[in-house]
Amino acid sequence: MEVVQVLPKDNYNVFVYFVDGKIKEYNVSHLVGKGVFSKLNDLDFYINNCTVLNGTLAWTLDGKYDKYNCIDIDPYTIYENGIEVEDPLVHIA
């Protein structure tokens, strides 16, 4: 299962687009402040560093989008636990 695009929202929800065309809304608030995810406490960091690395939802730690210097979430976790939604970008015109 591979992630191809992400769209973070300021409520710690992220729209996660998968290669099979499904879109899942996944809330990461349960991770914020815990271990490696403590950086997500900073909402600006959370939004501005949210990206796709290693085929999944990730946050670059150095701004260089290095696949080894990031925090990420297993795409299967997102796929199984996220809520399937319609593309939120369809409604923006």
List the model feature ranges, each with a label.
Residues M1-A93:
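Motif-centric detector for short Cys/His coordination patterns
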